[in-house]
Design a protein with these regions (language model features):
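Noncatalytic modules at the cell exterior or secretory-pathway interfaces
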Residues: 38-41, 87-108, 442-446
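Edge beta-strands of jelly-roll/beta-sandwich modules across compartments, strongly enriched
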Residues: 51-53, 105-117
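C-terminal functional module detector
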Residues: 120, 133-136, 310-314, 321-470
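Surface-exposed beta-strand/loop patches in noncatalytic accessory domains
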Residues: 11-22, 45-82, 92, 419
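A metal-dependent hydrolase metal-coordination microenvironment
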Residues: 130-271, 277, 283-303, 318-328, ...
Length: 537
């Protein structure tokens, strides 16, 4: 931001104090803004090496910005503000410094804040625009993206919008969600940036970064409350705020516990099942593939516990990229698109991508967009069909797995959170059928494709019990006589001898990918170990 004019300083205020572990995670310090103020310069520091403090500002109306551990001087103004902070009127009256005790390395930490009140703007405004709901591409298909990307509007990140765009394009992504820490300062800026881009969709969002867990909100243009424990705020309140803003909420890196210290403060999810009915998603993988062997199985177990409890939570992925490096990063670092979240959506728009996640129509590629594509479809006795995320009612179901590009890998069918059956993928165009009888309480099925560790994970198809044949000791006959038993025998014969056609040829590709759950019949499942063409386009 370049200088515009020299401003006169109306007044300067210095505040200081001590922080201890007692008294909660946050300290709020009020201060008065004099009339005539157009811009505020904010500087803060503390005296204890190894300590991490977070800082934000609240105006009389509430949230004004959250720089977190950002140590640089901050400008908050009517015409322009520093990164992480909102631009707008400087209302005279009582404002507040918001201090978060992220990590205290001593029993007492001394902090100092200096505020300078100016009568004129000193920085050039950046282009801003209101959000415009855009459709960048019509039509349903699998769209590839990343729900967890930080821009320079996060206090601990450096990536410009241009760098994010260039890297996302290079990796073949269709969308990215800007999940900047506890702020929406990026929203108007990226709306202006989006106006000249037609091949990459930027989603509105933020990372709600608390000291007990992080989560991405997708679809909000207002700040989501993150001060858990302050003024009685609970995680349920935060989830309610996200829902009220029209956003979905995805739990980020839920098992990323790096122990004591400030390596990743509050990264692991510690809120248990509180408010889980308001959670739309959970990151199955975050950042570098190097983390999959360390945290992968723990996250899957947590996900299955949620599903066992009845929550239809969608598995997603997110890079947590902070720098947008165009070259592949060193081991352990993240890059946009690793992992890649592939969403079946009716079009490339924010609303359609969000709806795809709500419906569970998601496949996660843990290494990136070039990983194999895995799909799962289900067909019931009556011809009703389901794709990933759907529910089908059937007493017996045919599950068809299709893999593109995974020759030599192992494909595992998971049923209700347990490994059910595995097959070796024989070729780069592979299909396999599993036939299962539905349990009395229903079933859920997903696929995991692996080498040494998981490479691709699908979301679930849900199967509810259909009309069951009468209990006659296994003969299939009705105990009351009549034609009931014969009917079920004939139905079984029709089922076992139904015509099968190769549905995954290149000419039938579009038909394969359009969901018609309970609204018509898809092509019949392909025979075991047949070849064809399938992919995420």
């Amino acid at each position: 931001m370049s200088a515009v004019v020299l401003a006169a300083v109306i007044s300067t205020l210095t505040l200081e104090g001590d922080l201890t572990p007692e008294g909660g995670d946050y300290l709020v310090v009020p201060f008065e803004v004099p009339a005539g103020t157009v811009e505020i310069l904010f500087h803060h520091q503390h005296d204890t090496p190894g300590t991490t403090l977070d800082f934000g500002i609240e105006d009389p109306g509430g949230f004004r910005g959250w720089g977190g551990r950002l140590g640089e001087d901050t400008v908050i103004g009517e015409q322009e503000s520093s990164r992480c902070y909102l631009t707008g009127p400087i209302e005279p009256g009582t404002w507040r410094i918001d201090i978060g005790k992220a990590f205290l390395s001593a029993d007492r930490v001394h902090w100092t804040a200096t505020l300078e009140f100016r009568d004129a703007a000193t920085v050039e405004p950046r282009p801003r625009a209101d959000f415009e709901a855009r459709v960048l591409e019509p039509g349903p298909r699998w769209y590839r993206g990343d729900f967890h990307v930080h821009s320079h509007e996060s206090g601990d990140a450096s990536a410009s919008f241009e760098a994010i765009r260039d890297l996302a394009r290079a990796r073949g992504l269709d969308f990215v969600n800007l999940s900047d820490h506890n702020t929406v300062s990026q929203q108007a800026l990226v709306a202006a940036f989006q106006s000249s881009i037609d091949d990459l969709l930027f989603l509105r969002g933020s990372e709600v970064t608390t000291y007990g867990g992080h989560g991405t909100s997708v679809g909000n243009d207002v700040y989501i409350e993150h001060h858990i424990g302050r003024d009685g705020v609970t995680i349920e309140d935060t989830l309610d705020a996200a829902a009220a803003a029209g956003a979905i909420f995805i739990i980020n890196h839920p098992e990323l516990d790096l122990g004591d210290g400030d390596a990743c403060i509050g990264c692991a999810w510690s809120y248990g099942d509180a408010g889980i009915d308001r959670v739309s998603g959970i990151e199955l993988a975050t950042g570098s593939y190097d983390y999959v062997p360390v945290f992968g199985r723990q996250v899957l177990a947590m996900w299955d516990e949620m599903l066992d409890a009845g929550a239809h939570v969608t598995g997603t992925g997110g890079s947590d990229d902070h720098d947008a490096p165009i070259e592949p990063p060193a081991s352990g670092d993240s890059q946009i698109g690793t992992p890649c979240t592939v969403v079946w959506a009716d079009e490339l728009s924010e609303a359609a991508i969000i709806e795809g996640v709500r419906r569970g129509r998601v496949v996660v590629k843990l290494r990136g967009p070039d990983d194999p594509m895995v799909e799962l479809t289900a067909t019931g006795e009556d011809g009703s069909t389901a794709m990933i995320g759907d529910t089908v009612r059937a007493s017996q179901v045919a599950l068809t797995a299709r893999v593109e590009g995974g020759a030599g890998m192992t494909l595992v069918l998971w049923r209700n959170g347990a490994e059910d059956e595995s097959v070796v993928v024989e070729g780069d165009h592979f299909a396999h059928e599993f036939v299962r009888t539905t349990a009395a309480g229903g079933d859920r099925y997903r696929l995991q494709l692996a080498e040494a560790f998981d490479v691709v994970i699908t979301n679930h198809i849900w199967v509810e019990p259909g009309a069951q044949p009468p209990d006659d000791g296994g003969c299939g006959c009705s105990s009351g006589g009549g034609r009931g038993g014969l009917w079920w025998i004939l139905l079984a014969l029709v089922w076992l001898n139904r015509p099968r056609h190769r549905a995954c040829t290149s000419s039938g590709h579009d038909a394969l990918h359009h969901p018609h759950h309970r609204a018509g019949r898809r092509p019949d499942p392909v025979p075991l170990r047949t070849s064809g063409s399938v992919g995420d386009q």
